[in-house]
A protein has these predicted regions:
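Extracytosolic ligand-binding ectodomains
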Residues: 1-294
């Protein structure tokens, strides 16, 4: 295990190199889009190591030259941005300012969201990047406030600059309605701002299929909150690696890459969260499986 940092695309490959040097068969991760792309391009793909990210959502990763070694279990922001725009329209927002964390995830989602809200007839007053890791965001909020808007869309991270944007907005009275990207969704934000978020809304990936319901039960039995951001997607990423190993009868890196798509799709016996033993047993007998994720 190694820390990809989420925000440092220079340090992340070094962390991944250390893991690969230990002879790992595959990588579950990374988390954020920028570091995921850096690790995939510079470390994982050149070394023939499968990566399955549960949470890297940048549209740019769709066209990554991954040679068949990169996968993800979360949908692209190409869809997520449209959903967030649809919700913005439903909330009858007429104008919105946009601020995004200055990385691949932030820029990609901001571009999709801007185009989608404008297609709904919503005015975008300004689009500005913000840097993570600052102690104060009053200057960034002042710029957003000068452009105006019924709300400000905060595309970022709840423990980084995104939280700082909200704090500075509330302190100055610039905005009281926040449109939150998936990276901003989490209990810590509610704990920090409570009722000050009562006008705010956001979106995060999820599923209403059978696998989602099954996973909720499995997670509850294990004392895990299944509603947390990318919890189900993380389970799915690990499950696919294990099933791909069994399908090929080997922890060989090339074998895993060859079998990921086979176990993730039909034909085959449906395997749901909590049924990995069943799936492994079927694969050991030469049968096909179709993993239906959380």
């Amino acid at each position: 295990r190694a820390d990809s940092t989420c925000v440092d695309s220079a340090a992340a490959p070094a962390a991944a190199e250390g893991v690969i040097a230990q002879g790992v068969a595959a990588i579950m991760g990374a988390d954020c889009s920028g570091v995921t792309g850096a690790i995939a391009s510079n470390v994982a793909v050149p070394n023939g190591v499968v990566m399955i990210s549960p949470s890297a959502t940048s549209p740019g990763l769709t066209t990554l030259d991954d040679k068949g070694y990169f996968f993800r279990t979360a949908p692209s922001d190409a869809r997520g941005g449209q959903i967030l725009a649809d919700i913005t329209k439903d909330r009858k927002v007429k104008s919105v300012a946009i601020t995004y964390t200055n990385n691949d995830y932030g820029k990609g989602l901001a571009d999709v969201y801007k185009a989608a809200v404008e297609a709904h007839g919503i005015k975008v007053t300004t689009v500005n990047a913000h840097e993570d890791g600052k102690a104060d965001y009053s200057s960034e909020v002042a710029t957003l406030a000068s452009a105006g808007g019924d709300a400000v869309a905060v595309i970022g991270y709840l423990d980084q600059g995104g939280k700082g944007i909200i704090q500075a907005s509330l302190d100055s009275g610039a905005f009281d309605t926040f449109v939150l990207s998936d990276g901003m969704i989490g209990q810590s934000l509610v704990d920090a701002f409570g009722k000050d978020l009562k006008k705010s809304f956001g979106s995060m990936p999820g599923s209403t299929g059978k696998g989602s319901g099954v996973f909720a039960g499995v997670a509850k039995a294990a004392g895990i909150d299944s509603s947390g951001p990318y919890t189900g997607e993380s389970y799915d990423a690990a499950a696919l690696i294990v099933l791909a190993m069994q399908a090929g009868g080997s922890a060989d890196r090339a074998s895993i890459a060859k079998n990921v798509m086979d176990v993730a799709n039909g034909p085959g016996t449906k395997i749901y969260p909590g049924e990995l033993k069943k799936g492994l047993d079927l694969l050991a007998k030469g049968k096909k499986v179709d993993y239906e994720g959380a």
